[in-house]
Swiss-Prot record:
GO terms for molecular function: glycosyltransferase activity. Keywords: Glycosyltransferase, Transferase. InterPro entries: Glyco_trans_2-like, Nucleotide-diphossugar_trans. This is Uncharacterized glycosyltransferase L193. It is an enzyme of class 2 (transferase). Its EC number is 2.4.-.-. It comes from the Viruses. The keyword Secreted does not apply. Belongs to the glycosyltransferase 2 family.
Length: 601
């Protein structure tokens, strides 16, 4: 009968799991287990400790029901190195890998040996693996990546395989890639039910919660895990082992009180950096609010899909994958749909749970309403924003709170040019928010009537995915009098708004819920020319009635703009009035409004 070595990498922090694994080892139905090699990473691992597994190993060695224990302390620093160290100590003909925190059924070894014994391939694995997340309390199946794929915890291989295959010692996860020659080696696939049940928890070497989170937002056809109507109890039929796992899981599930007064959770949002100078309005709002709260002595954390992490202006910016949704929070703010979903499905614990909506996308509103009783406050940016949600859902937003975005007053009060160009205008919003009509239907008439007119366009096409639309826009942006500057930092935008006479934003875009850029133009003295649609009714400037996109109406609009360009008296009058607009509110005052809301019972 083929002698087998079990190989496990472990750590003092996971000694409770290792104890349960020893019970799984004793329950194996394969009779010729020669040894159990255990590599202890306690002193060199990712969570270094002052204690190691020595005492537990002595218990194992005194347990006559366990195979011979080969114990060594790791000397390398990463998972690939530890696995290579383990392979250097094995003496069995077949090595069966077992992770310390996974459950292995009694036929794990016998099934692997049976599949490997004819040596049609030197390595076996399981591409379609079960795993259970203890906090989501959900049972999943990996859909699989192919016949030559497996994670290490499912692998078994002949000892001669390691004569020509090693792990990459420089990586902290995905060490299997090099060991399997980029998953090109022929691999026998083991049966899922006979191999492993992997557990996802908060002390995994690799955090699988990111996999679950990402899977929630992927389209059905590309999801790589499947939620199963299955329970751990169905898979583990040994009462003692099952109860041992439940004891550990209940400890790990216990909520810990957050160290932060305010947590802003952004989820798997499009990636950005808190150091960027050319952010959109929603991202700006996070930075300015968090910074103002920190100035008031609040301990603030922002969890997001960020480029830069660390403490910036008193705020801690943290990878969203490190957010522990099962903990207890004081103030927890879920930002847009990215922060709201999927965690709203679960039992979030917070004294106050707020959803900072920002967007006006109808599809998520039904989902939001489904969980409305969990939410303390819906944070909306305008009366239009609130009314729009109520109209779409047919429900009153009784706990909706209108707090608009603030304005960077000091920045936009700084004039960096001496005079304005009378015939210069700017557009400073996403290019899908009305720019096409301006460029195709209105601008050609304006420029024909007044060849000195200029339109300077800012924002860029990074968020536009329709290549045909991009191509069409590029052509429109190349017409006389139009200059496309793309994405630019605040200093350039401020300079533009002090050079331009008007901010031309004639739009009926329903997704505009506040319009920070218009309020910034008021501060800079750049007179907004806006429609009377949606939120624009609530913003100050020259309002033009929203008219259908026809040649006659576009000509009417163009003529009104021409009149404004030539009437310097009305320009100065408007500029003096608009600089005192009640919509110009500093971020400091807006942050205080939020704080007052936090402090209400």
């Amino acid at each position: 009968m083929i002698p087998v070595t079990i190989l496990t990498i472990s750590h003092f922090n996971r000694s409770d799991f290792l104890k349960i694994l020893s019970k799984c080892v004793k329950k194996q139905d394969y009779p010729n287990i020669k040894e159990w090699v255990i590599i202890d990473t306690s002193f060199v691992g990712y969570y270094k400790t002052q204690q190691d597994l020595s005492s537990l190993i002595e218990e194992f060695r005194n347990d006559t029901d366990l195979p011979a224990i080969v114990y060594n302390k790791a000397t390398t620093n990463n998972i690939g190195g530890w696995r290579n160290e383990g392979n250097s100590y094995v003496s069995g003909d077949i090595i069966v890998c077992m992770d310390d925190d996974d459950y292995y059924p009694p036929m794990r070894i016998s099934h692997a040996v049976e599949k490997l014994k004819d040596k049609s391939s030197l390595i076996a694995g399981c591409d379609k693996m079960y795993f259970f997340d203890i906090h989501y309390n959900e049972f999943y199946l990996f859909n699989g990546f192919g016949q030559t794929h497996s994670t290490n915890n499912c692998m078994a291989y002949w000892r001669e395989y390691i004569n020509s295959h090693t792990y990459d010692e420089t990586v902290t996860h995905a060490e299997e890639t090099k060991f399997t020659n980029d998953f090109k080696e022929p691999m026998i696939q083991l049966e899922t039910d006979k191999t492993v049940l992997q557990f996802s928890h908060n002390i995994n070497t690799y955090d699988k919660k990111h996999i679950i989170h990402t899977n929630h937002v992927l389209p059905k056809e590309v999801k790589y895990i499947t939620l199963l109507n299955k329970s751990v109890r169905e898979f583990i039929n040994n009462d003692e082992i099952y109860n041992d796992y439940e004891t550990i899981f209940n400890k790990l599930r216990q909520p810990v009180k957050s160290e932060y007064d305010i947590v802003y959770y952004l989820g798997l949002c499009p990636q950005w950096s808190p150091l960027q100078k050319n952010l959109g309005g929603s991202e700006q709002a996070v930075i300015y609010l968090a910074t103002e709260w920190a100035k008031q002595g609040k301990k603030v954390a922002v969890y997001g899909n960020l480029i830069h992490f660390g403490t910036i202006d008193g705020v801690e910016y943290i990878d969203f994958k490190k957010f522990q949704f099962w903990n207890q929070y004081d103030i927890l703010i879920l930002w847009r749909l990215y922060g709201f979903y999927p965690h709203i499905n679960y039992n979030l614990k917070a004294r106050k749970l707020l959803v900072d909506i920002h967007d006006n996308i109808p599809e998520p509103y039904e989902l939001l309403m489904r969980y409305k009783n969990k939410i303390t406050h819906w944070m909306v940016k305008s009366q239009y924003h609130k009314s729009y949600i109520e109209a779409i859902t047919g429900q009153e937003l009784s706990n909706g709170v209108i707090i608009p975005n603030g304005v960077r007053i000091k920045e936009f009060q700084k004039s960096v040019v001496e005079t304005r160009n009378q015939f210069r205008m700017c557009y400073c919003s996403c290019y899908v928010r009305g720019l096409h009509r301006i460029l195709s239907g209105i601008w050609p008439i304006i420029h024909q009537l007044e060849p000195r007119a200029e339109l300077h366009v800012y924002y860029g096409m990074d968020l536009i995915v329709d290549e045909n639309y991009k191509k069409e826009l590029k052509q429109l942006l190349s017409q006389p009098g139009v200059m496309d500057h793309g994405k630019q930092p605040i200093e350039i935008i401020n300079r533009e708004k002090h050079m331009s006479n008007f901010h031309f934003y004639y739009s009926d875009y329903p997704g505009e819920t506040d319009c920070i850029t218009i309020k910034e133009s008021l501060v800079a003295g750049c007179i907004p020319i806006i429609s009377d649609f949606g939120v624009f009714k609530e913003r100050h400037g020259v309002h033009l009635k929203w008219l259908p996109n026809t040649a006659d109406f576009n000509q009417n609009i163009a003529h009104i703009v021409i009149e404004l360009l030539h009437d310097t008296n009305i320009q100065e009058q408007l500029r003096k009035e608009l600089v005192n607009s009640s919509t110009i509110i500093s971020w400091e005052k807006i942050a205080n409004e939020w704080i007052n809301l936090f402090e209400t019972p």
